[in-house]
């Protein structure tokens, strides 16, 4: 009987919980008797918008701030469209927060216990309210709608499907509107929202994780009857022009053809609004980058797509690089850098390497009174004639302009613009770098220590030593003559022994079973034939420079065109790597692997003869602004699929399981039909059939392409190549080079840049512009998704190459990638080759045998 009663009680309790959940999850109203507490939310009647407590940093456990905000209910990741308490974030325990109707206002309260109060600062807005269970509670108003009190007891706050939160004087739809969120926007303009001309503005977030008001805003200029974007409430840098003409221009966008997006300008009631098809989702956002963007939600792709951004050039955003910062749109992100002699000054609380809002400050202070300052010319600059920072002298030649600045210690810089002389007596803002032979020369005042005076010192030094030099030379001639003969004898003997040793190694190579005459059309060429084929390694025959030496184009006596790789004497690749590359390519035969035709080991020279690839390496096309236009979407996918097939052969289907270890764009060669072929096997490793991973003392490869476990711990596996392939795939889709991100300047790596873009727009913004409209957006998004799966930190999280081949050829659902660790890289394609000990145990590298 007791068990039966217990079951009935549990059933009754469960029904009550279910019914209460249904009520709380379906309500769209906050009333006097129905406040919102903790993480409770209200949802618009059409299940479109949701309002409640959120945090922009859900992954942070310490110092987490909370805000009352509104977001799309079925959009992921969470997209915030309105924030109530932008300037008053909530901290501490979220369960103490209460959003309720009080005295005709919607008010956000923070009920703080006496214990918690003792650890908080400032009590000016808190007062004892009541004693509950022995704890004294303090009551704080964090945010309020701030309207005149209403005598009605039926005041309600209702969330509508338009995204408008309305405070009205009663439950009926005809009740008077006391306040609405559309009149107090944050950074987002939603369909149906009205911009009251001359009073309302949209202000960007301070950063992607900080909703507080930022530096940029969208306002209405009543004098020009146009929308303008403004920096720091003081400097406008973009204008729509006459509003009517600007609104009409939207009809010309191909992405908007067939939609019902329309703008309405009502000058009588002084507002502007826009409407869309109820089934679609559009929004206009004032972004943290200072760009005003029109975005549409793609249901199939589950991402926001930017249709329009104004201004479309990041460098047109006023002061995007701060004081004495130079903006260059053609530069790899970030587009900002400091002028010479200056260093970046971080904004308070910011450690973002892309953030130049704090501007740049001098490395060495000026000492004008000592006449120790000089002027450094910076060419091809677009100058901003801001009247607050630059004085315009309407007359005077270039020499006059320079002399005026030199004589004035407050002059920071000058420039001559035709007949005008520009003089900066304060900080210089909005400097832009243009293409060669464009713009003007900007003369920057620097301390002498920041400008090289090596030539002057060299001249003075040469004068001082002109008397001593003949005496020194005379005393050294006799000694030098004695040493020359001795040196020639010793060096000749060393060269002779080295040649004998190398020829012995060469014979070992030929006789040791690595290469046999039954090989795949392999042949040995003597050095003389190769010299003839390359015209003595002429510059005109040079195709490029690889990690281990230059590559030349040659023509054999039988008329065949070949590519000849000449191992550099300074290269870290020795005879071991040379043997490795020869044996691997001989034993590996696949249409997506480069074919080795011959070799030469003679004296100091080690050469490999490959089949000639008319389109050279992928990096020569991909990272060239003009040549990249040849790589349309179909061609890029052909390269991606061919590379995966070649890599799958190495990992799974070849006689030897091979880990390449240096997969990158410069090691992907393209034939005349753009078929990719993987090359450069000098650093490859042979794995046993059942071997999963290996360790090495010697880390070889290229910064930016190496997996974390390999670069930091020397652990090699198939997943090391998968990581490199992920970076290569990101490069192919974005057209950006992984090794352009400099570690010393603390710039983001390519992976960090791609990850942030993927989080914001599912990666749409990173797709290479030269592809124009040739690409399939869905395929591009899928490739970016696959690439991010490949560059995950842990090898076990990365897919196998066979899984990648399947992902690229199917449209099955992909797993969600984990955020990778953002690593920085060295400047340029720098080969890494160093030795370290793992757990103090000596490891040796396997050689091909």
Curated annotation (Swiss-Prot):
Organism of derivation: Arabidopsis thaliana (Mouse-ear cress)
Protein name per the record: G-type lectin S-receptor-like serine/threonine-protein kinase At4g11900
Residues recorded as bearing Phosphothreonine in the entry: 696, 844
MF-aspect GO terms: ATP binding; calmodulin binding; carbohydrate binding; protein serine kinase activity; protein serine/threonine kinase activity
CDD domains linked to this entry: B_lectin (cd00028), PAN_AP_plant (cd01098), STKc_IRAK (cd14066)
Membrane topology: Single-pass type I membrane protein
Domain Protein kinase: 537-822
Active site: 662
Sites carrying sugar chains: 111, 148, 172, 232, 450
């Amino acid at each position: 009987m007791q068990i039966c009663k217990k079951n009935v009680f549990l059933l009754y309790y469960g029904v009550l919980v279910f019914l209460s959940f249904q009520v709380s999850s379906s309500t769209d109203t906050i009333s006097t008797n129905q406040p919102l507490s903790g993480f409770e939310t209200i949802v618009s009647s059409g299940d479109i918008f949701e309002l409640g407590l959120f945090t922009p940093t859900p992954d942070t456990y310490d110092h987490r701030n909370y805000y009352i905000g509104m977001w799309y209910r079925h959009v992921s990741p969470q997209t915030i469209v309105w924030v109530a308490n932008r300037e008053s974030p909530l901290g501490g325990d979220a369960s103490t927060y209460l959003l309720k109707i009080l005295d005709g206002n919607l008010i956000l309260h923070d009920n703080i216990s006496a214990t918690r109060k003792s650890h908080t600062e400032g009590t000016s807005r808190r007062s004892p309210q009541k004693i509950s269970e022995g704890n004294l509670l303090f009551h704080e108003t964090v945010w309020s709608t701030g309207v005149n009190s209403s005598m009605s007891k039926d005041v309600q706050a209702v969330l509508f499907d338009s995204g408008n939160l309305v405070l009205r004087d009663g439950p009926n739809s005809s009740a008077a509107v006391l306040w609405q969120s559309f009149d107090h926007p944050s950074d987002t303009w939603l369909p149906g929202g009205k911009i009251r001309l001359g009073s309302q503005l949209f202000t960007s977030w301070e950063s992607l994780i900080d909703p507080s008001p930022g530096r940029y805003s969208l306002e209405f200029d009543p004098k020009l009857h146009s929308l303008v974007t403004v920096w720091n409430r003081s400097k406008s840098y973009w204008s729509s022009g006459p509003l009517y003409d600007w609104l009409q221009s939207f009809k010309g966008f191909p992405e908007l053809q067939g939609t019902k997006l329309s703008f309405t300008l009502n000058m009588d009631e002084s507002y502007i609004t826009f409407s869309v098809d109820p089934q679609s989702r559009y929004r206009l956002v004032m972004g943290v980058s200072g760009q005003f963007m029109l975005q549409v939600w793609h249901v199939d792709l589950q991402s926001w797509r930017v249709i329009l951004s104004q201004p479309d050039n990041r460098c047109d955003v006023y002061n995007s690089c701060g004081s004495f910062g130079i903006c260059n749109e053609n530069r790899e992100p970030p587009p900002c850098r400091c002028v010479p002699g200056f260093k970046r000054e971080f904004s308070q609380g910011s450690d973002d390497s892309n953030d130049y809002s704090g501007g740049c400050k001098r490395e060495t202070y000026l000492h004008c009174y000592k006449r120790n300052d000089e002027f450094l010319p910076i060419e091809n600059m677009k100058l901003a004639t801001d009247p607050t920072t630059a004085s315009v002298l309407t007359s005077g030649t270039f020499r006059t302009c320079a002399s005026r600045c030199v004589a004035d210690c407050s002059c920071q810089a000058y420039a001559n613009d035709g007949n005008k002389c520009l003089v900066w007596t304060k900080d210089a803002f909005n400097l832009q770098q243009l293409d060669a032979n464009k713009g003007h020369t900007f003369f920057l005042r620097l301390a002498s220590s920041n400008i090289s005076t090596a030539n002057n010192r060299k001249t003075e030094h040469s004068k001082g030593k002109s008397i001593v030099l003949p005496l020194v030379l005379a005393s050294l001639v006799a000694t030098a003559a004695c040493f020359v003969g001795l040196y020639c004898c010793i060096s000749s003997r060393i060269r002779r022994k080295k040649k004998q040793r190398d020829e012995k190694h060469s014979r070992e190579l030929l006789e040791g079973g690595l290469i046999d005459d039954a090989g795949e059309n392999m042949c040995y060429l003597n050095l003389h034939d190769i010299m003839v084929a390359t015209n003595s390694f002429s510059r005109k025959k040079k195709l490029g420079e690889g990690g281990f030496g230059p590559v030349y184009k040659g023509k054999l006596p039988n008329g065949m065109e070949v590519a000849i790789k000449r191992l550099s004497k300074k290269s870290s690749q020795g005879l071991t790597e040379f043997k490795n590359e020869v044996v691997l390519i001989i034993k590996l035969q696949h249409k997506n692997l480069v074919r080795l035709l011959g070799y030469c080991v003679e004296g100091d020279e080690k050469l490999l003869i490959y089949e000639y690839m008319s389109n050279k390496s992928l990096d020569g096309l991909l990272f060239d602004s003009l040549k990249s236009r040849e790589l349309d979407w179909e061609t890029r996918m052909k390269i991606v699929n061919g590379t995966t097939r070649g890599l799958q052969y190495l990992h799974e289907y070849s006689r030897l399981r091979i880990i390449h270890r240096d997969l990158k764009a410069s090691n992907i060669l393209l034939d005349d039909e753009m078929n990719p072929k993987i090359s450069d096997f000098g650093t490859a490793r042979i794995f046993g059939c059942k071997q999963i991973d290996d360790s090495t003392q010697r880390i070889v490869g290229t910064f930016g392409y190496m997996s974390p476990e390999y670069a930091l711990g020397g652990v090699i596996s198939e997943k090391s190549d998968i990581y490199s392939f992920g970076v290569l795939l990101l490069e192919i889709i974005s057209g950006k080079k992984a090794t352009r991100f400099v570690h010393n300047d603390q710039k983001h790596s390519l992976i960090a840049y791609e990850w942030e873009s993927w989080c914001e727009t599912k990666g749409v913004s990173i797709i290479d512009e030269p592809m124009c409209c040739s690409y399939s957006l869905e395929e591009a998004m899928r490739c970016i998704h696959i690439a991010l799966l490949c560059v995950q930190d842990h090898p076990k999280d990365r897919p196998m190459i066979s899984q990648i081949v399947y992902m690229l050829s199917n449209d099955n659902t992909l797993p969600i990638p984990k955020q990778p660790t953002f690593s920085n890289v060295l400047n340029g394609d720098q080969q890494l080759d160093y030795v370290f000990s793992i757990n103090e145990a000596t490891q040796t590298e396997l050689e091909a045998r």
